[in-house]
Amino acid sequence: MDKKILIADDSLFMRTMLRDILSDKYKIVEAGTGLKAEQQFKKEKPDLTLLDIIMPEGEEEGIRVLQKIGEANPGARVVMITAVGQDAVIKKCKKLGAVDYIVKPFDREEVIKTVQKYLG
């Protein structure tokens, strides 16, 4: 369990669900706001970040955090979590460095498959 995942989502329910899916194989750290996500990323240096697009600070807070992470850590692996499956938003995230995305609602197998693609 040496690989670390940062789960950044304002929903405690979503963080709990993702933690339950992934904590058997990976170390999990969490953040409930964009600011906390930035702080946790700097402190914990996760191998992969699962980042919600819409956070309490604003509709595109996750995109702002993605940009900050990418500027400070080129090559950081960030998978966006979105309830907004719009092509324009997804393209914007990929342009800013997101390696992938998961659309809510998602199932357990989709999460595992996506994470394993980047962490094994």
Model feature map: region roles:
Residues E44-L50, M55:
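Active-site beta3 strand of CheY-like receiver
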Residues D2-F13, L18, T49:
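Conserved acidic segment of CheY-like receiver
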Residues L12-V29, Y118:
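Two-component/phosphorelay signaling modules centered on CheY-like receiver
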Residues Y26-G34, Q40:
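Short hydrophobic/Thr-rich beta-strand motif most characteristic of the beta2 strand and flanking loop
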Residues A88, F106-V115:
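C-terminal output helix
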Residues Q39, E61-P74:
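Short amphipathic alpha-helix used as the core "switch/output" element in two-component signaling
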